[in-house]
């Protein structure tokens, strides 16, 4: 069984993407807490590998990730790719509960307290045939550098 961590594609959620393109990565995960992500295409590569080599995966739980960054580090990556400053802003947890509900509140509380624990260096060593994308590689492959040109900077 493969267990993917948070999807890099979550950055396409409207409010998240618009905020980033306007220079603000807003997230309820603490600034000092590493957050693991993976590209959906990398999940597909692992699924294909599991079918090709079932003996390695049957009865096993393999947590998979390609990137591990704190939110300030992720903001720096977005800044490099977009060619303009992106700053991290921590969202207060009570806002998460109020606007997103109990389930999202519990999920982000878990991210802040524990979070995913995929061993990325070990995954890269054990499965060299799968190129696990870093956040920067994924952003560039997805064309985020072009997206930045279509959004006006915030006033003020």
Name what the model sees in each region.
Residues 1-87, 94-103:
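Oxidoreductase cofactor-interface core, primarily capturing Rossmann-like NAD(P)-dependent enzymes
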Residues 93-156:
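A hydrophobic C-terminal alpha-helical subdomain
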């Amino acid at each position: 069984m493969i267990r993917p961590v948070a999807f890099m594609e979550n950055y396409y959620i409207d409010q998240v993407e618009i905020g980033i393109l306007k220079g603000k990565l807003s997230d309820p995960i603490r600034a000092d807490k590493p957050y693991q992500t993976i590209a959906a295409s990398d999940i597909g590569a692992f699924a294909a590998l599991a079918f090709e080599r079932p003996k390695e995966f049957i009865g096993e739980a393999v947590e998979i990730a390609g990137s591990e960054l704190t939110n300030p580090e992720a903001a720096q990556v977005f800044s490099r790719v977009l060619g303009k400053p992106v700053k991290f802003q921590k969202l207060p947890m009570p806002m998460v509960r109020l606007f997103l509900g109990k389930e999202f509140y519990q999920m982000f509380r878990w991210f802040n307290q524990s979070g995913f624990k995929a061993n990325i260096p070990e995954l890269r060593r054990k499965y060299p045939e799968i190129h696990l994308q870093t956040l920067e590689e994924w952003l560039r492959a997805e064309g985020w550098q072009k997206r930045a040109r279509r959004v006006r900077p915030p006033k003020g």
